[in-house]
Amino acid sequence: MATNAKPVYKRILLKLSGEALQGTEGFGIDASILDRMAQEIKELVELGIQVGVVIGGGNLFRGAGLAKAGMNRVVGDHMGMLATVMNGLAMRDALHRAYVNARLMSAIPLNGVCDSYSWAEAISLLRNNRVVILSAGTGNPFFTTDSAACLRGIEIEADVVLKATKVDGVFTADPAKDPTATMYEQLTYSEVLEKELKVMDLAAFTLARDHKLPIRVFNMNKPGALRRVVMGEKEGTLITE
């Protein structure tokens, strides 16, 4: 790769799943994975890319199981939102330890813990090359953190949502179950809907489609994949018009 290559994106929204933070433990936060992700985000900041981050909460709390056991869905979703704030606190701390300026914002007010989400403030911070971690989802029950990622991506006028997963991209079938599954390099929004490919939940996906926000699905466990994505190299699956 030529050393003078420039990033293809100026501002990104990175969506990390909570599960991505748990490592092999199956629960909680793996400190070594957290530190590696912080280093990869630091690389982007050093390239001059403005980074917004949305993190899920599935490594700390899963509401679906408790909902089946009779817990009120709204209560479960509120607990899930708090789990994303806990992940956000951990990520902010890891970034600070890597000497990266980061701010944590929450869609629900948590005075003394982090700032409340403000669109204008988030944009201002991004322009000053601060990493902005956007937690507590949309602040509403019944909306996933994928929906939050697309919503915040549209609000902060990100060039793309980068959805970090445990697989290399979007496949014709589940690669864990079907060895013949092949990966798509590029798809349109309508192709994803026609083929019923599981990229995100429908609410999140249609939000991105309606606002022409590109989505790139890639494997965060692959060292250097995030950098390759922002440099415009072949990595993962790109979904656009």
Swiss-Prot record:
Q: Where does ATP bind?
A: 15-18, 58, 62, 92-96, 101-103, 165, 171, 174
**Effect in UniProt of substituting residue 93 to A:** Loss of activation by GTP and of inhibition by UTP
Activity regulation annotation text? Allosterically activated by GTP. Competitively inhibited by magnesium-free UTP. Magnesium-bound UTP is unable to inhibit enzyme activity.
- Effect in UniProt of substituting residue 62 to H: Loss of activation by GTP and decreased affinity for UTP
The answer to whether UniProt assigns keyword Lipid biosynthesis to this entry is: no
User: For this protein, what reaction is catalysed?
Assistant: UMP + ATP = UDP + ADP
Q: What is its subcellular localisation? A: Cytoplasm
Q: Which domain of life is it from?
A: Bacteria
Pathway(s) served: Pyrimidine metabolism; CTP biosynthesis via de novo pathway; UDP from UMP (UMPK route): step 1/1
Q: Which GO terms describe its molecular function?
A: ATP binding; identical protein binding; UMP kinase activity
Look up the record and report any one GO term of the cellular component aspect. cytosol
Q: Could you list this entry's UniProt keywords, alphabetically sorted.
A: Allosteric enzyme, ATP-binding, Cytoplasm, Kinase, Nucleotide-binding, Pyrimidine biosynthesis, Transferase
Q: Where is this region: Involved in allosteric activation by GTP?
A: 23-28
Q: Does the keyword ATP-binding apply?
A: yes
Any single biological process term in GO: pyrimidine nucleotide biosynthetic process
Q: What is its EC number?
A: 2.7.4.22
| EC category | transferase
What does changing residue 146 to N do? Answer: Drastically reduced activity
Location, primary (coarse class): cytoplasm
Q: Which residues bind UMP?
A: 57, 77, 138-145
Misc note: The peripheral distribution of PyrH is related most probably to its role in the synthesis of membrane sugar components.
Function as written in the Swiss-Prot or TrEMBL entry: Catalyzes the reversible phosphorylation of UMP to UDP, with ATP as the most efficient phosphate donor.
Subunit comment: Homohexamer.
Q: What's this protein's family per the entry?
A: Belongs to the UMP kinase family.
Protein name in UniProt? Uridylate kinase
